[in-house]
Design a protein with these regions (language model features):
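Hydrophobic regular-secondary-structure patch
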Residues: 1-99, 105-108, 112-114
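Low-complexity, intrinsically disordered/propeptide-like segments
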Residues: 6, 11, 124, 137, ...
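Hydrophobic beta-strand segments of well-ordered beta-sheets in folded domains
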Residues: 7, 46-48, 72-78, 99-103, ...
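Leucine-rich solenoid repeat modules
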Residues: 9, 152-219
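Phenylalanine-focused residue identity feature
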Residues: 21, 134, 141, 147-149, ...
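Leucine-rich repeat
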Residues: 37-42, 59-72, 89-99, 113-126, ...
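Concave beta-strand-loop units of leucine-rich repeat
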Residues: 78-84, 104-111, 130-139, 159-165, ...
Length: 219
């Protein structure tokens, strides 16, 4: 039974890009046993890895319209590769998942978030651990909007992968609970960044009582 649960847990953590529903393949397995269904639903929705706009929209429909109670199980959300993500779908998804403790976004989903009202509202997802991957595209004015969101009021740990020059920009955010920032610098970017820039960024964060750690082990 334990092995069965571990296998199902692994299955539901991944989203098939060709599927029109995040956990489409899971339901046939769970339908075998009602007891198994009730035990695995919280596991199935604990961590959601969304890799397409369709997956986000389908999940939003499930959590907002079909089964709102499932939203209480969601503790982690990762959204990537959603260039054409509808802002309203993302907004409704974030407003429904009030118990999220960690979140991961790439550039595309971060830009989509800037087009919604979700980050500015008092209700909705408020993660404690936040991870951003800014290596897949460029951010311009969106960054100023992004770091000012009320959504980040509870963030204690921030993990960023991308251009070190963005570190100083992010230091201007509110970040009332933030204690540490770990910045993963791709080796391809290290040769173009001076140590002076990195030292200045560390000082900016240090002045706020926040620790910034550079990590250039990322490839």
């Amino acid at each position: 039974y334990d092995l069965h649960c571990r296998i199902l847990s692994h299955v539901v953590r991944s989203v098939d890009l060709t599927s029109d529903f995040p956990h489409q393949g899971l339901w046939r397995i769970l339908s075998v046993s009602r007891d198994m269904y009730h035990k695995m639903i919280p596991v199935a929705y604990r961590a959601l890895y969304l890799r397409s706009p369709v997956s986000v929209n389908r999940l939003r429909y499930t959590l907002v319209v079909q089964c709102p109670s499932y939203a209480t199980y969601v503790q982690h959300i990762s959204i990537c590769h959603c260039e054409d993500l509808a802002p309203l779908a993302l907004e409704q998804l974030l407003l429904s998942t009030t118990r999220v403790s960690s979140m991961h976004l790439d550039v595309a989903s971060a830009k989509a978030m800037c087009m919604t009202q979700a980050g500015r509202l008092s209700k909705g997802a408020k993660p404690v651990i936040l991870s951003w991957d800014f290596t897949t595209g460029a951010l311009s004015f969106e960054l100023d909007l992004l770091f000012s969101f009320d959504m980040w009021q509870r963030v204690e740990s921030l993990y960023v992968r991308g251009d070190p020059r963005l570190a100083q920009v992010l230091s201007h955010g509110l970040w009332p609970k933030l204690r540490q920032v770990r910045w993963f610098v791709p080796l391809t970017m290290m040769k173009d960044i001076s140590t002076v820039v990195m030292a200045q960024a560390m000082q900016k964060w240090s002045n706020r009582g926040i620790s910034l750690v550079w990590d250039n082990s990322a490839t």
